[in-house]
Amino acid sequence: VEKIKLPQVHIHPWKIWKFGILFLFILLLGCGHSPSITATLVPSPLPSPLPTAGITTISTPDTEAAARAYLNAWKQEDYPSMYAMLTQVSKDAISEDAFTQKYRSVASEAALSNGIDYQILSKLTTPKSAQVNYRVVLHSILVGDIQRDTVMNLSLENGQWRVQWDDALILPELSGGNHLSMDYKIPSRANIYDRNGHALVAQQDAVAIGFNTGEIHQNQQDELLNLITRMTNGRIRPETLGPQIDNYRNNGGWYLPVTDIAADELAPYEARLSGFAGVILQPFRTRYYVDDIAPHVVGYMSAIQKDEVEVMARLGYKWNERIGRDGLELWGEKYLAGKRGGTLYVMDPSGKTVTVLADSSTEPSQAIYTTLDRDLQLGAQQALNGFIGAIVVVNKNTGEVLAMASSPSFNPNLFEPTNYNSQLLIGNLYGEDRPLYNRATQGQYPLGSVFKIVTMAAALKSGIYTPDTTYNCGYHFDELVNVTLNDWTYDHFQKDGKTQPSGLLTLPQGLMRSCNPFFWHIGLDLYSRGMTTAISDMARGFGLSKSTGIEISEETGNIPVPASPLDSTNNAIGQGATLVTPLQVADFVAAVGNGGTLYKPTVVEKIVPPDGQPTYVFTPTISSHLPISSTDLTTIQDAMVSVIKDPHGTAHQVFPNFPYAVAGKTGTAQDPPRDPHAWFVGYTFVNRPDKPDIAVAVVLENQGEGSDWAAPIFRGIVQLYFSGQRSTFPWETQPGVWKTPTPSVTDTPSPQDTATP
């Protein structure tokens, strides 16, 4: 008999209890006429619920967060943090230094100027391991973006995800110890020209010239020196080179480095020069800086240094290249160097090519045409021979810099290692006189009495002073408590016994005579009236104490706010803590001359690729306007004209019968305990259609009085600009040749003495 297994029925005890009560109730109802029974039903208590089972949940760390932490550290080039995230097995396989070098090598070889970016694509997580798929983009300045999808494997160690590292985490192609190698494609560097197309810098053959002084025949020496002077257009003078030859000859006949010259410039003289005993010519090919023209504007190139190799590699440069270091060579690197290209190879550990990872072509370099006028620039450089100082010449109505000279100057060709004279002369570039320092834009000087232009503007704007305001200009200023200041006329009286004080002057006459007491009074008066910042605010409105925006390196100077009555007097005449650059001064003097517009100065006229279609052409940029009325500006202009035209003007005797309309201001800025700086600034208003009017600033460090030294140079620059030649300075026998270390002093009757503080 087949047994049938009945299904088990499970009935909860509570249901059985309820069923029993119901049965008893029915039974009682069926007992006829039995006496009624009142029953109170009390249910049994419910069984207590079972306690909740104890469950411990162990959470797995966020896989994506771990991957992002690693990739973010890579993006930030935080290699120590990346290494700290590796598994112990990975750390055992590669040291931190080797790990770091892997990433740095890729960044350098691939020229990752902008680093990397990444994107998480997906993830897969198990209790003990995980995989994260990500896309990495390497941004190469040479071959463009390199994009790869890669897998990161992670292991759980001590409750944290750790990266299982191998080379493929950088790029899949680097698996197995492969590495990258860049084959650079470098366009030829473009030239730099003056505004008229004359080459200032170009690739060409050159020759280093030197003398074996022991072999030079003394009876031929003068002829040889004169030939060198002609070859170098007067840059090297017999009176300078001759004593050097004698000194070297008398001390063993050593080799004397003389100069270098472009091969085509040497050609007409080469046969004659080679005929002199002791002359040594060493040819070389280089990026040649013609005639050392405007080296502080053009700049120079030099080799990449050891500590720069990695940084420059990231920018697409080979370790053995030369780069722009200053001036336009630095500013215009992206134009002059062109767009570099390259082929990025994957190489196996034996050095064999595995594949080409990326490739790009070059784009041609672009020439820079400067605003400089070659002949005017050479004239400005010659005018500074024997001085330490600077000259700036700007187009009065556009801000274009026509000449910018700084002295002492330097020869950029000495940075060329194939120049035979380089190793012997390059040390001179780092002497105490700092020839590499651009005094025109980086030199910061007290402005002296030239600053009175600013103070006069502040006085007129205040409403307290008018052109008719007068002041008795005596020898002394005694408005300060317990301090007496002396006018320049008193200092001269102590020397010559006859210079008289200027007497009663109107405000414009005060500028014409450069009366210190008048301007001391203005500074103190404005300060005492609570107009503490009137002069400093005006100075900033004239563009001082801020960058001009020119393309090359510059300093901002300093315009202080007076903190005491004595400060207020010092600041009013451009002394105290007042500092300016010659470029700033030329810029604001141009604004005074053009009606009040401050232009952003520039040395770049246009940028031109090989096809001849400029990618940039200069247009004037207005920086601001002088914060004075046209009426007040006219008053200042007239006063500056009187500095030159009025017989009592401090520069009158420098411009006798001068054919060009000019306005200016002398300045002699005290620099104790040394001699003062000589200043002269001014502008022309000739209005010739073929020659735009100019503004000029001249400063000579610790040279003396502005009227004696700087004013004649200003006059010569104006002559050269308009006529192509200049007269001889008082200290010269001919242009560029000094006759004495100081100019002769011409006695002039008072009050025509020209010294100004």
Predicted feature descriptions by range:
Residues 34-43, 119, 123-390, 410-439, ...:
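Extracytoplasmic/periplasmic proteins that interact with beta-lactams or build/remodel peptidoglycan
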